[in-house]
């Protein structure tokens, strides 16, 4: 999932590896929830702002740090990602959220997170069993396994599902 960010940031020589500690490498660029023993740069890719910041941070490792305008060009093909680079206000939608990665997204869209009197339960596909007895409307969001590895496409898919609730 980090490969697209590495490419966009301008890193030409890299190796994709699911187990960086088992291979030779100078630096692992990985998702923030991953842990390795070697030197690493942890990035987050759940929201458009996190994606933007991650591209910027990774580009600092190259001879040409990208400026904001150069990074914004990458967002031009992705209307939803571009729209949500800044947080929105949609607090009329009240949701219960069952995952930390989804909380980032829900806050960005502007929904109010609550454990009482909510309109929807937002959950990742791997927690489907946890919502079987819910009385509220449940909205399943695909986890990393079931969406594109391209972070822009992943944002478009997940946010597209949640935008229907506004």
For each feature predicted by the language model, list its residue ranges.
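Ordered, amphipathic secondary-structure segments that act as subunit-interaction surfaces
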Residues: 48-74
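Binding-cleft/active-site segments that stabilize strongly anionic ligands or cofactors
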Residues: 3-48, 73, 77-166
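Generic structural marker for isolated residues within well-ordered, non-membrane alpha-helices
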Residues: 2-3, 55
